[in-house]
């Protein structure tokens, strides 16, 4: 196997050096040395976007009934921002973003898109690397995209401020191969370090018993101990790979930042909401991951979310837990209670 792997690598390098061709299962060359993920046919399924945006609206209503703002953030792919460098002959039509904007408006979802912002910034700055990590923005892209998100959060919480460049130490790190590949490159990529990182306490280990999808199990619970941070909101953010290794762009903007890998976990949104009791909820997805491969059609369509219950109004109807058979299991910060309810019960509070 080792000799076969070496032979494939040599063949790949030979094609690159002699013919300027990238023979690779994951990556492809665009113009001017740009590297992208392999091109695919744009075939967005409108049924998915209807189900997805309808579910976002139900989540938004759930949050607003509890006086908690919900914000959806859609981040563009590299192929969208640097369309002019796509391989010759590939005609990109930006269908996903176009359909998403229509559906988000149709369902009245509170959202931002970073597409236009990053396209504009890309005219003067490198917001995605030329070669390294073709699937995500770089730290400059994360800086500008996050500030746009924080500006939206500030509409509800004026104490939240967009970042200044001076909030970070900025270095450049040399990368000598493509991500998850032995394909050689030589590119200096930006790395932003949060100057207030010393005030951030990670308490993720206190939630080890938290239920997470087996395929999407990244999470982080970060508490801001800087003086004055108690005035900031507590955020529950469902996020993808644009942020899963970039907590540093949000950790200092909130008093507590609870980050959950999105996709299937977002279908169980109310489970996390009830545990973390946030002041604000954010869902972030990348354009290329906003499809049925990541969010199940069945979950989006059939997930039930409890309506708000006015406890004072229904005080006479409340029943003691002791009336039902139940088990209690304590683990770290979480206490799991299993209750056997009567048939016909549709919701519990």
Write out the residue ranges for each language-model feature:
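Extracellular glycan-modifying ectodomains
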Residues: 1-349
């Amino acid at each position: 196997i080792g000799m076969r792997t070496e032979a494939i690598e040599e063949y790949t390098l030979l094609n690159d050096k002699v013919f300027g061709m990238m023979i690779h299962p994951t990556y492809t060359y665009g113009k001017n040395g740009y590297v992208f993920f392999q091109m695919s046919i744009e075939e967005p399924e409108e049924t998915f976007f209807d189900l997805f945006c309808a579910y976002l609206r139900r989540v938004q209503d759930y949050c607003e009934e509890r006086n908690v703002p919900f914000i959806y953030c859609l981040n563009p792919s590299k192929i969208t921002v640097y369309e002019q460098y796509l391989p010759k002959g590939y005609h990109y039509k930006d269908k996903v973003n176009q359909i998403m904007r229509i559906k988000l408006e149709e369902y009245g979802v509170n959202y931002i898109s970073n597409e236009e912002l990053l396209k504009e910034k890309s005219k003067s700055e490198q917001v995605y690397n030329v070669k390294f990590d073709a699937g995500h923005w770089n730290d400059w892209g994360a800086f500008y995209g996050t500030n746009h998100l924080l500006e939206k959060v500030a509409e509800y919480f004026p104490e939240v401020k967009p970042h200044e460049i001076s909030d970070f130490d900025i270095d450049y790190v040399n990368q000598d191969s493509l991500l998850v590949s032995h394909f050689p490159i030589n590119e200096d990529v930006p790395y932003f370090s949060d100057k207030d990182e010393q005030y951030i306490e990670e308490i993720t280990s206190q939630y080890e018993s938290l239920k997470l999808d087996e395929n999407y199990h990244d999470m982080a619970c970060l508490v801001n101990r800087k003086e004055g941070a108690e005035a900031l909101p507590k955020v529950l953010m469902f996020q993808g790979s644009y942020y899963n290794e970039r907590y540093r762009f949000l950790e200092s903007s909130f008093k507590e930042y609870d980050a959950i890998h999105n996709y299937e976990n977002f279908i169980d949104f109310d489970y996390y909401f009830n545990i973390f009791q946030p002041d604000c909820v954010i869902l972030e997805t990348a354009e290329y991951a906003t499809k049925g491969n990541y969010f199940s059609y069945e979950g989006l369509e059939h997930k039930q979310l409890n309506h708000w219950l006015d406890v004072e109004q229904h005080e006479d109807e409340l029943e003691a837990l002791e009336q039902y058979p139940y088990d209690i299991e304590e683990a770290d910060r979480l206490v799991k209670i299993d209750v056997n309810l009567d048939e016909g019960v549709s919701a519990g509070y």
